């Protein structure tokens, strides 16, 4: 599975529509499994992951020591399994977190990338991973 996580990160880093991405375990250690180095999502800590998956009413979560604003939250819903956010700082960028059976996929678009495109890309990655049982 590790190779698959790194492939997702590699795909995202080659695409100039996205600014940041990470894959984070939410079942056991709640640690970063793969990320674009030296970016915000590479700094995600376990406490931030716990807050995202346990607090359904979270409005302004910290992720990688920065604040974000929740737009929609269906992260723990088995049919949707996504959360949409915006950066809580300028320039405003769209973010989507999608949940697989074992990990969270974080994807941040550039300020010029549409929310819909970030959503579709992130959810597609999660759907493909879910199909493998992970």
UniProtKB/Swiss-Prot annotation:
SUPFAM superfamilies: Profilin (actin-binding protein). One of its GO terms (molecular function) is actin binding. It is found in: Host cytoplasm. GO terms for biological process: actin-dependent intracellular transport of virus towards nucleus; symbiont entry into host cell. Transmembrane segments: none annotated. Coiled coil: none annotated. Its main location: host cell. The keyword Electron transport does not apply. Keywords: Actin-binding, Actin-dependent inwards viral transport, Cytoplasmic inwards viral transport, Host cytoplasm, Host-virus interaction, Virus entry into host cell. This is Profilin. It holds the Pfam family Profilin. GO terms for cellular component: host cell; host cell cytoplasm. Belongs to the profilin family. Interacts with host Tpm1. Interacts with protein A25. Participates in either intracellular transport of viral proteins or intercellular spread of the virus. Cellular profilins modulate actin filament dynamics (polymerization and depolymerization) via direct binding to actin through an actin-binding domain as well as by modulation of other actin-binding proteins. In contrast to cellular homologs, the poxvirus profilins seem to bind actin only weakly.
């Amino acid at each position: 599975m590790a190779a698959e996580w790194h492939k997702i990160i590699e795909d995202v880093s080659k695409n100039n529509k996205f600014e940041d991405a990470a894959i984070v375990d939410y079942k056991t250690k709640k640690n970063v499994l793969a990320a674009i180095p030296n970016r915000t999502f590479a700094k995600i800590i376990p406490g931030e992951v716990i807050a995202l998956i346990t607090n359904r009413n979270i409005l302004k979560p910290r992720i990688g020591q920065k604040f974000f604003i929740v737009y929609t939250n269906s992260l723990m819903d088995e049919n949707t399994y996504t959360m949409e956010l915006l950066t809580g700082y300028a320039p405003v960028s769209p973010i989507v977190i999608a949940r697989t059976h074992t990990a969270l996929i974080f994807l941040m678009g550039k300020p010029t990338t549409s929310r819909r495109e970030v959503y579709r890309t992130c959810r597609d990655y999660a759907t493909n991973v879910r199909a493998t049982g992970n």
